[in-house]
Amino acid sequence: LTPEGDKVKLFELVYFQKHASKEVLEHWNILVGRQPLPNIGLRTEDGWNISGDDVQIWLEEQGENSFAISAYCEKLLPMLREEEGRAWWMLTTLTDQVLGEIPHMRYIDSFDVLEEPKAEPSFLLSQLPDKLREQGLELSTDPEAYLESYLGYKMEPKQDPDADWRLDVMAGSTCCVPLINGYLNADNDFMDDLHADGAVAGFFCYPLDTLREEEGSQKIFDFRDKLEEVFTTDEGSEVLTLTGGATGLYCGYVDFIAWDIQEALNMAKEFFEGTDIPWAIFHTFRREAGSVPLKQQDDGTETENQDDEL
């Protein structure tokens, strides 16, 4: 099962893998992500044939555990000029199979195909795994280990309390950057793909003012931990997968992909009703969508932007 480099799709494939029936597993060994194969080559029906020894690679470090690849393959130059997309597919797929798709997704953040070689020294694609190991990287093909790697981020918060949800965020962490970026850019492609498969990505949102009444921020983090604990139980992890959280000027956020959204909302509703938090909502990562109230103000009023629809 290949996510084709799509991290959101990878969450779905891992969930599918873990829930495959015994009957299926008797006949199939389900692996997620293209597996590394030494001396692998790609051959097409119309005569194209390349291996890791046919591709020159230039590796550039972009940040911690983040690299850019530039690839040059003389054998594919005619294809690159006439069918550029196909040439890219062959080279990225070959890289998946030389390196392993999970390490490729984890460490290679930029991939460029060159029409002529660079002047700087290069190495062969077949040597890429060893070159990355020399950088101290672990080339694990375990998709769950990759999905559990979190990235911290900071934002310039909007002071307007009536701005869209999450625009007040100062800092957060996520193991699924595409969902955060998609929401902020009002890009619904990932949401559409999840929706087509019966899954929903979104976040719980609740006010922080009552938690801030005591000095320090520890109470804020303790509350988020308690909410997340509801969904790290066996029952909770069946209905959703946590993907991060954030702290804003006004609200706290807990992010997730839900496999059973109705049960996830029921569990969250029960949690919030047992707390002193005055209100809480669920909102999808579809920015223009309405919100679902999980707990309402004592006077029955709803918070800004709320409605009763998913």
Model-derived segments and their meaning:
Residues 2-21:
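An N-terminal, globular interaction/scaffold subdomain
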Residues 52-79, 273-283, 310:
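Extended, charge-rich low-complexity interaction segments
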